[in-house]
Structures are given as structure tokens and as C-alpha cells.
Swiss-Prot record, chain A:
This is General vesicular transport factor p115. It comes from the Eukaryota. It is found in: Cytoplasm, Cytosol; Golgi apparatus membrane. It comes from Rattus norvegicus (Rat). InterPro entries: ARM-like, ARM-type_fold, Armadillo, P115_Arm_rpt, Uso1_p115_C, Vesicle_P115, Vesicle_Uso1_P115_head.
Swiss-Prot record, chain B:
The modification N-acetylalanine is found at residue 2. A lipid is attached at residues 211-212 (S-geranylgeranyl cysteine). This is Ras-related protein Rab-2A. Switch I, switch II and the interswitch regions are characteristic of Rab GTPases and mediate the interactions with Rab downstream effectors. The switch regions undergo conformational changes upon nucleotide binding which drives interaction with specific sets of effector proteins, with most effectors only binding to GTP-bound Rab. Residues 2-19 are annotated as: Required for interaction with PRKCI. One of its GO terms (biological process) is protein transport. One of its GO terms (molecular function) is GTP binding. The gene is Rab2a. Prenylated. Prenylation is required for association with cellular membranes. It comes from Rattus norvegicus. It is a lipid-anchor. It comes from the Eukaryota.
Amino acid sequence: MNFLRGVMGGQSAGPQHTEAETIQKLCDRVASSTLLDDRRNAVRALKSLSKKYRLEVGIQAMEHLIHVLQTDRSDSEIIAYALDTLYNIISNDEEEEVEENSTRQSEDLGSQFTEIFIKQPENVTLLLSLLEEFDFHVRWPGVRLLTSLLKQLGPPVQQIILVSPMGVSKLMDLLADSREIIRNDGVLLLQALTRSNGAIQKIVAFENAFERLLDIITEEGNSDGGIVVEDCLILLQNLLKNNNSNQNFFKEGSYIQRMKAWFEVGDENPGWSAQKVTNLHLMLQLVRVLVSPTNPPGATSSCQKAMFQCGLLQQLCTILMATGIPADILTETINTVSEVIRGCQVNQDYFASVNAPSNPPRPAIVVLLMSMVNERQPFVLRCAVLYCFQCFLYKNEKGQGEIVATLLPSTIDATGNSVSAGQLLCGGLFSTDSLSNWCAAVALAHALQGNATQKEQLLRVQLATSIGNPPVSLLQQCTNILSQGSKIQTRVGLLMLLCTWLSNCPIAVTHFLHNSANVPFLTGQIAENLGEEEQLVQGLCALLLGISIYFNDNSLENYTKEKLKQLIEKRIGKENYIEKLGFISKHELYSRASQKPQPNFPSPEYMIFDHEFTKLVKELEGVITKAIYKSSEEDKKEEEVKKTLEQHDNIVTHYKNMIREQDLQLEELKQQVSTLKCQNEQLQTAVTQQASQIQQHKDQYNLLKVQLGKDNHHQGSHSDGAQVNGIQPEEISRLREEIEELRSHQVLLQSQLAEKDTVIENLRSSQVSGMSEQALATCSPRDAEQVAELKQELSALKSQLCSQSLEITRLQTENSELQQRAETLAKSVPVEGESELVTAAKTTDVEGRLSALLQETKELKNEIKALSEERTAIQKQLDSSNSTIAILQTEKDKLYLEVTDSKKEQDDLLVLLADQDQKILSLKSKLKDLGHPVEEEDESGDQEDDDDELDDGDRDQDI
Amino acid sequence: MAYAYLFKYIIIGDTGVGKSCLLLQFTDKRFQPVHDLTMGVEFGARMITIDGKQIKLQIWDTAGQESFRSITRSYYRGAAGALLVYDITRRDTFNHLTTWLEDARQHSNSNMVIMLIGNKSDLESRREVKKEEGEAFAREHGLIFMETSAKTASNVEEAFINTAKEIYEKIQEGVFDINNEANGIKIGPQHAATNASHGGNQGGQQAGGGCC
């Protein structure tokens, strides 16, 4: 090594000279020899010298070696030697055993040679193309050389590979190599290639790296696998860390599901090899990469869901509760579980339900908290538990409520059999171990974070101190301990808890101020001129006082906003106060804690700030400063303004509502209007349509009329059309005749009807006369005759009607036939035409005529319809006359009955008369017998006359 | 989660033609009028159904800028489908199609299905490239063609799904070697498993997959 150092110094001594000469000779041979064997031997010799005389070989031979790579590709042996030599020159790996001071130099050497090599980007491309050779002796040294180039000067080499076409893809093929050495070295190459280069990471992922690497890990036995698994895991981490696109691809490719198998660690395996611990550690970290709080929220939450759905979280919880897990792994598992559940309600709920397999089973949360407040547990483990607890409560109101509830009087388990989370936290808060104090305070603060309900609930908590003494509230106890002046860590923890508790909770502020010792204590702390160590506590006290002012609802007369402000001005001074307040954010550990949610401290002394608390400070520092500087008048004004603003708001909301209502109404009305408009339009269009239709009909009618006239004229001249359509006019004329006939029939019918009407009239009149004369007998035969006549006529009419309707149907069929014929003709016409123009004209003419004819037929149809209507009318009349006849008949029958009745009466009277005559005669004879004068005969004769007269009348009637 | 096939797509075309918006509309069903320039490539995925089969689409949206061209070229080889996008309101993006197509044909596998997309069809008033021109270009180069609007979501589904249909048909015809993942096609885990256990039942479509 002295030797090398001499060279580096630039002082050439005797013995080196010969070596340099040898190298020079070898280089000349490589350059000039025409024989491959010669060249190969020379390169081999260079290779053997390259380790020992790295600098010389590097300086003199690099150019020649690259040339060999370009020109001698056909001989794999010489290529292999050349690659090995280059690797020896560039790589620093072989120098590891060398003492410290020379390592630095050799590192420089490696990077310098790398720089020379990549100065020509084609050299790297050349190397990439050599990797396509399947020959092991070429591929393997090629991989190693490229790896060391990447290790030496990552970014420029990455850039060259990225730009060369399919460069990354070619390197990805190494993972598919069946020779394990190449595959494994390929993994290392890809590690170097993907280091902090997002673009390459994405291409590698695109080329199915996830699939391949997960396959390799599975093949190698997951965490039980060797260093290859470790290398694969590191590569996976490279691909996923801070690369959202790849994380999304990983999740979408359902690769999270494949991670579950990694954590199926059996209890039966007590021996944990160092490699297994490393592998598992990397596996856990890979899970954390996917759910890191610094990832975009959407990405993290979808991964969290997937981890619960595939059972990965459950598997991790099993490890958490298992025995015999190395503390290192356990800690990382707790951290991993923390991030898997953080802010994800489903996972948090699941975590709350996990029980330790103890007897009786205890919730995992309780078991973990026991470790947190246990001094004997490793520091990192306690930090991890705190983190886990924080993550469990992050955005988890339900969980916060459950934790606080374990402290409330109503829910505390009276039997005291099982320890609750709340008891453990209180125990930690007031234990003698300051680390426990801090952790418990921060944990409790997280149970209150952003949850006003729990802040109020926690005020109810009472602590039993010692027997005989009255219970003390938790808030009181915290301030008591604070004033006792314990370790800084304890006080900082308690102050953070109090600040979190009081912020956004005026009731808690009132409770706090109610204890008259608190404000003097705070002002005393802030005002005192203490050493640097106490500055942080002073700052926190200032913050607490500021919170007591800012969230004060002025319910305590002694401690209104105004009075507290005056107190600051008198006792501390505004400027001084603000300066003290500023101590918090100026603290060196403050910015550290504000970066990441995980409480990650190198040692317990650094455990000062909590991440969520730093957020609170950021939020409050400004507003408190403003509140302190504001005068009371301004305060009042502001309040007034607030009030008026509220009023305005009310008015505005009122109007807004009104506007909303009106808007709704407007909308309704608009709709109505639009529907009405629509209807109106529809109607109007209907009207115009109808009008136009009417117009059309009129026009058609006129046209028809005209054409009919024309048709007669042109029939002769249009021999072609006439020949084709000749049938039609004839037919129509025939139809017309028939209609004429029908009309005459109708006329006839009508006249007959009129006749019948008169007959009926006669009948009626005769009936009336008959009734008055009481001579109905003669009437009836006449009537019957008439009825018979009528009936006959009716039947005749009916038959006529029948025949007419038959004729009509016939006509109709004929008509339709005609129409069909006309249509076919119309179709055939254009085909027959000779010149297009003529035919077109003709066809239009024919079409016109056709339509005219159609119109005519339509009209005829209409007439037929009218006729049939008339017929039905006649039928109706007939029916009505028939019914009148029937009525008359019944009346006649009635009259007959009456006549017969009166005849009977007459007969009866005649009989009676005859009887009486006889009686009279007998009486007369008796009287004569008795010798009575027979003068009374006259009288009886007169009576008889009278009777005769009556008889005559009766007789008349009979006649 | 289970899918019958997995297709890899790439989206290419000039910068600002709306590639990322098309992807966003397809995967998230939303439109973002102001979109950051894509750096390199971004990944998106969605499940679709064709012929009753679940098909997972993995889509790589590439940067259109010239400076990223070398990076985006690395994605051609492993893709089964490409959406080549131009902007109907910018003629230059249409004029560059030939370059894009040459690039794609040079670096991709020969069976890659390319869908030509004229995006921003909602901006009819600013149209510079007629639909007929797009159709003609597609006809001339054997591409499928469609006009889309990432803003109104018009035809966006169709563009992605029709490309998948074309690939699916090619698989049925046996054009694609589905066992070579470098083609951008993968058989789903369940599918492959059932294929192996009782290959006869599944038969037909992927007979080549399980048997040989």
C-alpha cells in the first residue's frame, strides 16, 4: 500500500517504473496485436495486475479495454477478462480490508474512474448490450461492473440508462435468469439502479418487478429465506418508498394480499436467526411504507382497508400478542400496527377488540399500556406503545370516549379485578418515573384531542388520594404535581396535557381558574428569571395562561379576560410574556417533533414534545399573541361586532331562506308557464295543421274538379296513359250511374216512407174518430189491412235495402280493386316510358289523375256512407211507425173490450125488463082477479113507454 | 378483486391533449380542469367487464413533453393497448400523430392495439381537426378511432372498453401469447388456477394457456 500511495503522490520511484512499463507493454499488445490469443493473454495479464496496480492499469488500460469490448464481442473469454479488469479498477469492494486512511483515497479512485468511463455514454450503452449476451462469463461480470458504476455515481449512470432505449427493461430481464447468481446480483443491480430515481422505479415496477420479487421471496421461504430475501425486500422498499404511483400499482395489483403470508410466524419456532429478524424487520417496514402518515390520505386509507380485508392486520396483531418474539421485532410490529390502524375507523375498532391470550383475557390496549408505564421495558418499546395508543385514538371519537369512560365513577369496575386503561394512565401520570408521567400525560392528551365532549367528561374524574382525605379532581391533582416542582419531563408532560385539555373548552378553563393557586403559580413561573433549562417550562406556562385568557368565557369575576390581561401587564409585562411564549417553538426539539407523528427519540432525555401538541402550539401562538396585545376596548368592540355580525347573519339566513322559498315558487311557476306554453304551441300547431289539411282538401277537391274536366278532354290524346288507365274512367262512370240508381232508389224509398207516414196519420185520425163515435168494429178490419200493407211495404223496403247494401259492398270492393290497379299502373308507367322527361310528365299527370280518381272514389264512398245513413234513418222511422201501430192495436183491443162489456150490460137490462114486464103482467092479472080498478094500466103504460125509449137507445147502440 | 385477465395500457400523445384527464375520468369519474404536468408516468387502474368476464385494466399515463420521451418509451414494450390522443382544437397535436405512431410501432410488440382518440370534443367551436380527418388517419394506419371529451365523459368509457374488447378478441383468435407477460396481458389468479385444475371445463378461450 505504501507503493500505491507513492504513485498517488505523483512521485515515481524505481520499482514501480518496471510495473508501469509492463502495463504499458500489455496495453500495446492489446491495442496492436492482430492475433486474438495474444490480445486475450494480454487482457488476462492486465486483469491479474489490476487489483494490485489499480491506478496504473486504470489510467493506461481503460481505453484499450473499452475498445476490446467494442471489437472482440465474438470471444466471450476476452470480454470476460476485460469486464473483470474494469470491475477491479472501478469497484471499491475489494479494498474493504484496507486501513481507514486509504479507503478514502480508493473511493475517490473508484469514482474518478467511473467518471472517465461514463464520460462517453456509449460505454454504458455498450455495457447494457453486453448484458444481453446469455454467456455467464459475460453477463455476470457485466452485471457486477454496472452495479459498481451505479454505486459510484448513481444519478448520471441512471440518467444514461434511462435514456438508452429499453435500458431499464433489459436489466429487468436479469430477474428472470435461471442462474441464481445472476438473478441475485441482478437484484443488487436493480437496488442501485432504483435508488432515489422515481422514473426508473416506475419502469421497473411496470416490468412486473413486484410479481417477480414476491415470487422470489415466496420461493426462498419468506422470512426464513436468506440474504436474497433481504435484498429483494430492500429493492421493494426502493420501489415503493415515497412513490405514490408505484404504491397505487402495488395495491391495485393485489400484492398487499401476498404480504400476509410473510407474517405467518409460528410460535413453535423458538430460534430467531439474525437473518430472519432482519427479513421480518424489512417486511414490517414495507407495510409501513404503504400506510405511512406522510402518504396522501386517500392512498393510505385504501391500503389500510386492504390490509384489514386480507387479514394482514389480524396477522400482525397475532404477532403482537404472541410470546417469544424478539423485542426488536415486537417494537416494529407495534409501530406497524399503529400505522395500519391510524385514522381508519374499521381497523381501530378491530384493534380495540383484540384480546391478549391471557387468563382472564385482557384487551390488547391494556396489555400494551402496562408496558408503556413499566420502567423495566425497553425505551423504544414504550415509545412504540405510546405511538400505537396515539394512532388508535387518532380521529377516533369512539375510542376516545371509551378510554375516558374507564376513568369515570359510573363505569369503574368496583371489584377491581381487571385493570382498566384509565387506571393505568392515572397510575403512569402520578408514578415516580418521569418517563411514565410524560407518556401517560401525552396519551391522555390524545384521548382529548379535538373532542370537546371528552374534555368536559374528564373534569368529572375524582381521585382518591389517601384514606381520610377527600377525593381530588384529576385536574386539581395535575396542577398540584406541577407546583411541586418535579422533573422537567414530568412538568412538560403535564403542561401539554393541561394545554390540550383547556384549549377550546371554556368550562375546563373555568375549572382551572377556580383553583385560586393556579394563576399565581403560572405568573410566578413566567415572571421568574430562571436558567435555560426552565425556559421551556416557562414557555408552556405562558401558553397555558394564554389559553386561559383566549378561551375564557368571563364566568369567574376574579379571572375575566380583562383581569388576567392586566395581571400579565403588571406582573410580567406584555413583551416579556410574548418572548416567553416564543420559547416553545424555538426549542431545538420542537421542529423535530413537528415533522412526524411517531414519537421517535434517540434517548429518553429527548422525549419532550408530542407531535399533536406542536400542531396545537402552531395554531394558538398567533391568536394568543393577538389576544394579549388587544386592549379591552378593542375586545369589547370586537364582541359587539361579533354580535352585530351574528345578527346580520341571522337576517341574512332569514333572507336566504326567503329567497330559497321564492326561488322554489318561481321554479314552479316557470314550469307551469313552460307547460302551458307547450300546450299552447301544440294546440296552435294542431290548428294550423288542420287548417292546412282543410286547405289541402279544398285544393285537392278543386284540382279534382278541374282534372275531371280535363280528363275527359285529354283522354283521347293521352293514348298511352288512357290505354293504361282507360278502365278507370269507365268504371267511374259506371259507379256514378250506380250511385244515381241508388239515389233514385232512395227517393223511392223516401216517397214510400212518406206514404207510410200518411197512412199512419190516417190511422191515428181514424182511431180518434172511432173512439168518439163508439163504432169501432168497422175500424179494426181497415186497420189490420193497413198494417198488413205497411208490413209488406216494410219487407219490400228491407229487401231493397239489403240489395242496396250488397251493391254498396260490391262497389266498395270494386273500388279497392280499382285503386290497386291504379297503383300498379302508376308503378308500371315509369318503366314503360321511353324518354325520362316524357315519362316523368306522364307519370305526374297520371299520378294527378289517379289522386283525382282516388278523391272521387272517396267522395263516392262518402255518398254511399250518406246513403247508408239515410237508410238507417228510414229504418228508424219504420220502427217508430211500427211501434205506433202496435200502440194503436192495443187501444183498439181496449175499445173492443169496452164494447163487449156494454153489450153484456144491455142484455142484462133486457132480461131484467122482461122479468119486470112479466111481474107487472102477473100483478095486473092479480089485481083484475081481486076486482081492483085497472086505471093504473095507463100509468104502467107510460112507464113502459119510457122503458121502450130506453130500449130503443140500447138497440141503436147495438146496431 | 378476482379478474379473468389483466391488460396493461399506456396513454400517449402530445402534452396538454388531456391524457391525464382521460385517465382521471375513467378511474375516478371526475374532471379536473387544471391539471399539473405529468412527470414521467402515473399509474391508474380500474375493473371492467367484457363478455361477462372481469378484466383489470392497469393504465400508465405518460408525460407528453419531449423531455420525457425517453422515459415513456420504456413503457411501450410491456403494453397490450395504447391510447394515442390528440386535441381536436390543436392541429399540431394531430400533425404529430405520425411521429407518435412510428415511435409506438418501433418500440412496442407488433400486436399492441392502438386506439386513436380525438379529445376535447366538447369544444366544438374551437375545433381545428375534423372528425373525418381523424377517421381517415385511423383507417390509413389500421387504428380504432373515437372522439372523446374527458370533461363531459363522452365516449371515455367506450374508448377504454373498446380497446379492451379488441385485445380480448385478439386473445380469442390466438394472436396474443397470453403466457408472455411482456405482452401486457396476464391471466387472473383464479382463472389460471381453475385452468390448471380442470382445464377442460374452462376450455375454449384460453385453451392455449392451461394445456401446453
